[in-house]
Design a protein with these regions (language model features):
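Short alpha-helical donor nucleotide-sugar binding micro-motif in glycosyltransferases
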Residues: 267, 276-281
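Aromatic "clamp/platform" in nucleotide-sugar-dependent glycosyltransferases that forms part
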Residues: 289
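A short helix/loop element that forms part of the nucleotide-sugar donor recognition site in Leloir-type
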Residues: 186-199
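Short hydrophobic beta-strand element within catalytic cores of glycosyltransferases
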Residues: 306-309
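A conserved mid-protein helix/loop that constitutes part of the nucleotide-sugar donor-binding site
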Residues: 19, 204-230, 237, 244-250, ...
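Conserved acidic donor-binding segment of nucleotide-sugar-dependent glycosyltransferases
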Residues: 320-321, 325-332, 341-347
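Nucleotide-activated donor-binding/catalytic signature segment of Leloir-type glycosyltransferases, i.e.
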Residues: 247-268
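Donor nucleotide-sugar binding/catalytic pocket of nucleotide-sugar-dependent glycosyltransferases
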Residues: 39, 52-53, 136-189
Length: 392
């Protein structure tokens, strides 16, 4: 199986899409598939096997991102033709989508897309001068047009599949979440992380991992921390990530006088730093309303960290009773009460940590890669079988 992936984002840009692509590429390679990725050039790349970097420019409203040159992608057409791909897998809806569709047509290949981002609840955060209702309607129309222009759509959750059906998308929907690599189940160095960042060994530490973006609802976590610290003054929330809402979150932390209760540590290396960070945490907290899956929840569970999270969109697929997660209502007071209870009840917290670790095993990246490879095989053979909306 020889697959051409194309994406508007990839490492060093850190986000869930980059993580998903990397995870599937590694697991598919272990299963004998060859995956070539077309992605933006961020500068400073070394030698990269099976990655074609495309000249790109910074995006004005989000300098972390890049816009690839459409023409430069199409210039790769003959080289790509010589590689004899079996299908094109589009990962993002910007230049990558239109170039991916064009390449698939030129090369006579089937084309699928993974719908990673819930744009209906995303776009208006970045174009705030237009009414949110307009932006939601635009996002729906945009998604409907793009998804109906491919041969199949991979979705990471039941909620996202249902949403796309409501948009009027007619093409087959294939439910294949991103799984957790085996390495994420290995223990990190809890005390080494705390020593590095000057966090006392007995400080009750909560953790958020992810892009510091407006749609992540991190301000909710700050307000919950503000309430919870009234009963646990030494409570600490560590935020591991960067993004366009960073200054806004820092300002809110100052307004709430949370300087001693919130620590922003930026992005961490996934191979070592992130693993240690998860191991250092007593709780993982999350309140995003726009996740198509919520992969960081599974990463925390794999590390044996109990989770407190609201349930919206894709996170509902993960936050099952058997996960050991505490799922309060979308209410700051209730969320804060859950934090206080979990921090105070050490034995219950340990039980939920073990439960979470066992549960995460059922989301292995290998099992999900098997599903993806089977889909590729069916698409290559001109079949849309396997399109049922069932995770397991």
């Amino acid at each position: 199986m020889n697959v051409l992936m194309i994406s508007d984002v990839y490492f060093p840009r850190v986000n869930g899409v980059s993580t998903s692509i990397e995870t599937f590429r590694k697991e598919l390679s272990r299963r004998g598939a060859s995956v070539t990725l077309v992605a933006p050039d961020y500068g400073g790349h070394g030698e990269e096997e099976d990655i074609i970097r495309i000249p790109s420019k910074k995006v004005m409203f989000d300098p972390e991102d890049r816009m690839m040159s459409y023409g430069a992608i199409l210039e790769q057409k003959e080289e790509l033709r010589n590689r004899q791909f079996d299908l094109v897998h589009i990962q993002t809806p910007f230049v990558a989508h239109y170039a991916g569709v064009a390449l698939a047509k030129e090369l006579g290949l089937p084309k699928i897309v993974t719908y990673h981002t819930f744009f209906e609840e995303y776009l208006y955060h970045y174009i705030p001068f237009l009414p949110a209702s307009w932006m939601r309607a635009l996002a729906r129309r945009f998604s409907r047009t793009q998804c109906n222009d491919v041969d199949g759509i991979v979705v990471p959750s039941h909620a996202m599949a249902k949403t796309l059906e409501q948009y009027g998308i007619q093409k087959p929907l294939h439910l294949i979440p991103t799984g957790i690599p085996e390495a994420m189940f290995e223990s990190g160095e809890r005390m080494a992380f705390r020593d590095k960042y000057g966090i006392a060994h007995d400080t009750p530490m909560m953790l958020f991992v992810g892009r510091v973006a407006f749609e992540k609802n991190i301000e909710f976590l700050l307000h919950a921390t503000d309430l919870a610290r009234r009963q646990i003054p030494e409570l600490l929330l560590v935020i591991a990530g960067e993004g366009p809402a960073l200054r806004s979150i820092e300002k809110l932390a100052c307004t709430l006088r949370l300087e001693k209760n919130v620590r922003m540590i930026g992005y961490l290396d996934r191979e070592k730093g992130l693993k240690d960070c998860y191991s250092a945490a007593d709780l993982f907290v999350f309140a995003s309303r726009t996740e198509t899956q919520g992969l960081v929840l599974l990463e925390a569970m794999a590390a044996g960290v109990p989770v407190i999270s609201t349930a919206h969109m894709g996170t509902k697929d993960i936050l099952k009773e058997e996960s050991g997660a505490v799922v309060p209502q979308d209410d700051i007071g209730e969320f804060a009460a859950a934090i206080v209870h979990m921090i105070s009840e050490v034995e219950k917290r340990s039980e939920r940590a073990l439960q979470a670790h066992r549960y995460a095993r059922s989301w292995s990246s290998g099992a999900m890669a098997d599903k993806m490879r089977n889909l590729y095989k069916n698409m290559k053979e001109g079949s849309s079988t396997g399109a049922s909306i069932t995770v397991r």
